[in-house]
Amino acid sequence: MGLIAPWCLALCLLIIAATARAEMVANLYDAAVPVKEQTQSTFRRAASEGLERVLIRVSGRSQVSDRADIASALANPEPLVVQYRYHQPLAPDNDPSAVDESPSLMLELSYSPRQVNALLQSAGLPVWSANRPSMLVWLVADTASGRRFVGGGEQPELQALMNDEALRRGLPLQLPLFDLTDTANLSVNQVWQLSAPAVREASQRYGSAYILVGRASEFSTGQWVASWLLLDGDVVRTFESDGMGARQALASAVDRVADVQAERYAVLNGGAGAGSSLIQIDGIADFRSYAALMGYLESLAIVRHANSVWVSDRELVVDLVLNDDMEKAQRFLAMDGRLQEVSGNGQQGSPSGVPPQLMVRNRYRWVGAAR
C-alpha cells in the first residue's frame, strides 16, 4: 500500500505528460502530388488534391468531398498546409518516353493533423488514428507467364501496385516471407482455391489482425478480375473486384478492406455511445508501469481522458472518458495486446477489493508498454 501516496501525488503530472503516440502508419497527414509548374494556381489545385487524399486516409471513408465543410476546405486548402517542398523525381534510365516528355515536379505537402481532425469532426466524419491493424496479403496472379505468388521476388510490379494502394488508404500492409516455411505450409493452388483453413494455418506465424487472400486473372483485353477472402478472426468475408488494368482491381479490394477496418476503428467524436466507462487493470508492478499504462490510454484516439479513480498495490480502476462507444474502445485495446482481457468481462459490478460504489465494466491485465 506504500505506493498509493506517491501515485496520487504524481497523477496530475502524469496525465499532462502522457502524450506520446505510438504510430503504426507513418506520414498519415502527408501527400505527394505531381505538378508541371510552380505557379500559385497549380499549387492550389495540388494542395486540394493532396488534402482530399489525406482526408480519405484519416477518415477511413472513400468519399468525403460531398460534405459542405470538406468542399469548402478543398476550395481553399492553403490554411491547412504546414509544410511543402518541390523536388525533381529521377526518370528511369530505361524509359525512352522520358526523353520526349517534360519531366514532372513532385510537390510534397504536410497538413496540420489538428486542423484536419477538426475539419473531419465539423463535417460529421470519423477520425481514424495512425494505430491501425496490420493486414497480411496472400495473392496469386494468373498472367501470361502462369500462376505465381505476388511477393518474394515474384511479380514485383503487382507488389508495387498493392503497396501503393495500401499507402493510399493508410493500411499497414504485410507480405509473407515466402521462405521454406511458407513454401511448405501453403501452395499456389491452395491460395488459388481460396482455402481459408490452409491460409489460417500458414498465417499463424505472422500474427496479423487481418488476412487478405486473393486470386487475380489478367485477360488479353487488359481486363483484370479478382476474387477475395478477408479473414477477420472467425469472420470470413468474400467479394469480387475487377478493372481495366491491375491497379483498378487491386484498388477496389483495398478500398473494401479499408472500409471494413474503418467501420470498426475510426472514431466518430460524440457518437451515440460516447460517455465514460470504468475499467479495472491489474499487473501494475510499480510507478513506471503506471506511467506507461496511463500514457498508452491517453494516446488512443477513442480516449478523451483517462483518470485514475482508485489505486491499490498492483491494480487500479480507471475512468475512461470516450469519444465513441465502449465496444469500439474494446477493439482498440485488443488490437495490440498491451491490455489483455481477463475473465468476467462485461459483468457490471465491483470486484473483490474495489470499493462497491465503483461499478467496473471491464477487467484487463497490463502486460507491458510494448510488444
Predicted features by range, described:
Residues 132, 140-149, 241-244, 252-285:
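Acidic, glycine-rich low-complexity/disordered segments
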Residues 239-246, 265, 275-371:
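C-terminal soluble interaction/assembly domains
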Residues 25-32, 36, 203-251, 326-330, ...:
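Amphipathic beta-strand/beta-sheet edge segments enriched in Tyr/Trp
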Residues 47-73, 133, 137-144, 148-192, ...:
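N-terminal segment of the mature soluble domain
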Residues 1-8:
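Bacterial N-terminal signal peptides that target proteins for export
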Residues 17-19:
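N-terminal signal peptide c-region/cleavage motif recognized by signal peptidases
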Residues 63, 67-139, 151-152:
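Signal peptide-directed extracytoplasmic domains
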Residues 81-90, 174-177, 191-222, 310, ...:
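A short, hydrophobic beta-strand-centered structural micro-motif
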